[in-house]
Amino acid sequence: MARLSKRLKAISEKVDRTKYYPLQDALNLVRETAIAKFDESIDVAVNLGIDAKKSDQAVRGSVVLPAGTGKTVRVAVFAQGDKAREAAAAGADIVGFEDLAEQIKAGNIEFDVAIASPDAMRVVGQLGQILGPRGLMPNPKVGTVTPDVAGAVKNAKAGQVQYRADKGGIVQCTIGRASFTVDALTQNMMALIDALNKSKPAASKGIYLRKISVSSTMGIGVRVDQTSMR
């Protein structure tokens, strides 16, 4: 505990928690303070000006991060016939239909993303209580229920991430690793912000992007000056 406290104290001394840093300075600071023995993830928290309790102000979607996520993603696809062959050719790790559903019911969930062709939803629908709590349930809003299963597989492999505002109107998303360059993290950050702006509900009034901060897995939040992102 003493070692952890000493580490956090050292990080806190480098970060002025009352200051808003230009984006690249913030990312560089987060990288510098990511001193754990593993490659920490770099995470973004965006406080949105929405009333998340209202269905017409829900914010949810997906975006392909141009510099990737730094993570190897295993993709499972529910499809049959030509769609199954297309998914396999696109690089899906697991392809199946009712047989895949049975594997999942048996507790074999060895994938990070699940994709389904529309006709497969009659099978996938039975798995809601298993996949839902794990954030793996295919959904058309994030592009994981689609007739273009091959395209969805390629996007997932290329670094697609999903985002969703929680009950407090906050979106949290990983945009890379501490080993990424600042330029790579900046590209990913701007792609996420662009996607969030495009997802702005028509019913949202006033300031939409209220506060943005970045942090590493074991670090503390660094506030971002939004004027540096325009």
UniProtKB/Swiss-Prot annotation:
Origin species: Nitrosospira multiformis (strain ATCC 25196 / NCIMB 11849 / C 71)
GO MF term (any one): tRNA binding
Upper taxonomic lineage: Bacteria, Pseudomonadati, Pseudomonadota, Betaproteobacteria, Nitrosomonadales
Function: Binds directly to 23S rRNA. The L1 stalk is quite mobile in the ribosome, and is involved in E site tRNA release. Protein L1 is also a translational repressor protein, it controls the translation of the L11 operon by binding to its mRNA.
Keywords from the UniProt entry: Repressor, Ribonucleoprotein, Ribosomal protein, RNA-binding, rRNA-binding, Translation regulation, tRNA-binding
Pfam families: Ribosomal_L1
Cellular component annotations (GO), alphabetically ordered: cytosolic large ribosomal subunit
Protein name stated in the entry: Large ribosomal subunit protein uL1
Summary of subunit composition and partner proteins: Part of the 50S ribosomal subunit.
GO annotation terms (biological process): regulation of translation; translation
Family recorded in the similarity comment: Belongs to the universal ribosomal protein uL1 family.
Entry-linked PROSITE patterns: RIBOSOMAL_L1
